Amino acid sequence: MAGEIQDPFSLSFQGNSIHSGSISFGRFEKEGLSWEKRSSFSHNRYLEEVDKCSKPGSVTEMKAHFEAHFKKKGIRFPASLESQTWGVHQTSNEPDDEAVHATESFEDYRSDGSFSEDTSQSNSVCNYSHEQEKCGQGKSQCEFDEESDHCVSYDEILVNSDEVIELDEEEGGGDHGRVADLVECENLGPPEMPQEIVIQDSALVEEAGSKLDEHASKKPSNSMETPSSSVNVKPIIPNDVRVTKASTKGHDVTPKAASRRTKGSSLSSNSKTNVDAKSQKELRPKKTIESQPKSSNKTETRPPIATNRCKTSTTSSKLEMSTGSTSFRFKCSERAEKRKEFYMKLEEKIHAKKTETNQVQAKTQQKAEAEIKQFRKSLNFKATPMPSFYNIGTRPVSHNKTEPSKVAQSRSRPATSASITNRAVTRVSYKHGFEEAEMVKVMVSNRKQSAAKDSDLQKGNLMAVEMKQQIGARRSRN
């Protein structure tokens, strides 16, 4: 029994020692915690691609991979940022057949392959189109919208303008050249035939340049106006025009008419370039040949083509701006008017309260005055001669030497005056009534107060005289 009990205990101890450190909820430190299994959120498959691209050197690997892929497909991979941006800008309402074919093949590759490309790169590659055309005399025409060097923006110049560049080639060899401009367009001619672009009529180049400068200076980038006269301008081909050799393909491919009508259209211009066959012998060993500077270029210009700019779009935008501004101002003015009305109402209320209080005060004053008048009329007071004791004046006290007998006499006089006033009050009360007697009592009390004040003054004067006498006696003794 003891052996049977010890065996499962030892097995459980060994199982715990395998995991070594345990975490709560039945998980262990060495166990792989994949959040995809336990999370309620759906797995985002793009995170894996982000992890791949976040590693250092992944961008260069993808670039090399896609370059090899596009070389196999026969499509030229965009080599510069300018070509990428040109491919993004050159969007059309009617895509070409081979561009659609390129997009389909690229999407098939994305579904099969392990890498995914940015949208900007894929758009720039897919928007690139080329098509084969052959003429009887070996001339190829390429219609495309070209961005001129005079920086005329897409908003300035309007739609319905097509641009034609005719490249005159001589058929002869097996190799083909490639012209790399801001607009990418492949001219695949006979083999080992580098081409030099020769442009005619140098006198007309300056006229076209001056016209373009004046046109760009007169029209700002944001404003759109309809010109009265039609304009036909052929751009000067920039210095960046290069003729390169194609390395792999032996078939002839000429650029198709890629005339596109964009909403913010580019400048309409027609230019013809003639390619001389004499320069072939001189330029065979070179792979890339740069064109001569603008001063040596000769351009053939034609009378200007009509460029239509719509005034309705500008007027509509101006109307929208004006309506927006007027609505905003109208709201502000409404708020200001409401505030003014509110303050006016407050002022009117305050003025009304003030007028009410003033009216109440005036009414109370009028009532008080009327009551006083009525009270005076009810008294029936008549002016009577003053009693004789008011005419009796007190004798002036000598401030010099006075005797105590005189002081005693002056003290006894107010008592006699008080008795006289009492007698006068009694007489008045009998004659004129009770109200007049009260008035006389008030007058008598006032007289008593004045007499008491006079007596106090007399006492003070007497005390001062006594003090002076004492001081004089002391001095005489000394």
Swiss-Prot record:
Its main location: cytoplasm. It is found in: Cytoplasm, Cytoskeleton. One of its GO terms (cellular component) is cortical microtubule. Residues 201-326, 385-420 are annotated as: Disordered. Residues 208-217, 278-289 have a biased composition (Basic and acidic residues). Residues 219-232, 264-277, 309-326, 407-420 have a biased composition (Polar residues). Expressed in seedlings. It holds the Pfam family TPX2. Keywords: Cytoplasm, Cytoskeleton, Microtubule. The keyword Cytoplasm applies. InterPro entries: TPX2_C, WDL7. One of its GO terms (biological process) is response to abscisic acid. Microtubule-associated protein (MAP) that regulates the orientation of interphase cortical microtubules. Belongs to the TPX2 family. This is Protein WVD2-like 7. It comes from Arabidopsis thaliana.
